[in-house]
A protein has these predicted regions:
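Conserved acetyl-CoA-binding loop-helix of GNAT-fold acetyltransferases
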Residues: 70, 76-89, 93, 113, ...
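Extreme N-terminal starter segment of soluble prokaryotic enzymes
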Residues: 1-3
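Amide-forming acyltransferase catalytic core, primarily the GNAT-like/NAT-type
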Residues: 12-14, 116-203
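Active-site/acyl-donor-binding loops of N-acyltransferases
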Residues: 109, 114-133, 234-287
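Conserved beta-strand in the GNAT
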Residues: 43, 48-57, 64-69, 182, ...
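Active-site rim helix/loop that mediates acceptor-substrate recognition in acyltransferases
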Residues: 12-55, 160-180
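Conserved GNAT acetyl-CoA-binding A-motif
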Residues: 91-104, 230-241
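Flexible loop/N-cap segments at domain edges
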Residues: 178-180, 185-196, 200-239
């Protein structure tokens, strides 16, 4: 049994067994993680059999762990913990001592045993396109992310996530399953959205707006409407339970709580969590 650098070939056994996974979405998504940090994504292999995988995403002073998966034929043998500890070891070797995960509830006990602490719940909301109101405000523009320099987007993003994510943006804008849009007012960014699409839904990943903007509802609806791109698939949002106003805001624009939530957890040093205005977090594994 050994760790190997994660490659797309390591995904084949999961794709064959798990018919719920959409390969056209899953494969390019994992490729983003490998492209961003090829030395920090691992497969646990026994001979030619892939037993599990894990990814890491490093920013300025936090390291995200994501996509922890163990083949169901090999569960309850400690392999999940082994993969987690490998990821933690890699992050710490890079002199990053704040390790962050978005944990499914079923795995929370494992993470707590390793030493992770809960910070908040991330609640999932569903929004149907026909609930999104048309934009009646002409004071701002909604444009494709490609309309502005990535440095400008990264600077705006930094105010909310407190990490430089420029290199990640550079990778995901080339993923055909991602689309991104910005809201501009007087040439200034006041919000942005990324959406990723699979065969059944659209997933907001993330949605950030200036909540002090006088037309925040119109701004949010405008970003969501263009992100739908005339599709009828539901949008899913991952809303951090940091402030009750977030839930109230999303329900006021027509989003419905699904009842499902995950846990944001961390290990090691405290870090600065997202600032006010992050209505939906990004994909688990990269924040």
């Amino acid at each position: 049994m050994e760790f190997q650098p994660l490659t797309i070939k390591h995904l084949e056994s999961r794709l064959k067994k798990d018919l719920e996974v959409d390969p056209s979405w899953f494969v390019p998504h994992i490729q983003n993680f490998i492209s961003y940090n090829p030395k920090g994504c691992f497969a646990l292999v026994n001979r030619d059999k892939t037993l599990g995988i894990v990814t890491t995403t490093l920013y300025d002073n936090i390291g995200w762990i994501g996509w922890l998966y163990v083949d169901d034929s090999f569960r309850h043998q400690g392999l999940g913990e082994r993969l987690m500890r490998k990821a933690i070891e890699y992050i710490n070797k890079n002199k990053i001592y704040s390790v962050v995960i978005e944990a499914v509830r079923e795995a929370a006990t494992l993470y707590q045993r390793i030493g992770f602490e809960s910070q908040f719940e991330t609640h999932h909301f569903k929004l149907y396109p026909d609930k999104i109101k048309p934009n009646q405000n002409n004071n701002f523009q909604i444009l494709p992310i490609s309309s502005i320099p990535r440095e400008k987007l990264a600077d705006f993003d930094f105010k909310y996530f407190h990490q430089n994510r420029h290199e990640l943006f550079k990778i995901i804008v080339n993923n055909p399953k991602f689309s991104g849009y910005i809201a501009l007012e007087n040439k200034k960014i006041i919000g942005y959205i990324f959406v990723t699409e699979d065969s059944k839904s659209l997933q907001v990943s993330p949605l950030v707006i200036n909540l002090n903007h006088p037309h925040k509802y119109e701004l949010t609806n405008s970003l969501l409407r263009v992100a739908c791109n005339d599709k009828e698939k539901p949008l899913y949002l991952r809303c951090p339970s940091l402030r009750k106003q977030y839930f109230d805001f999303l329900t006021s624009i027509g989003a419905e709580p699904t009842g499902y939530f995950t846990y944001r957890m961390f290990l090691g040093k405290q870090y600065e969590i997202e600032s006010e205005g992050v209505l939906s977090l990004g994909c688990p594994g990269k924040g």
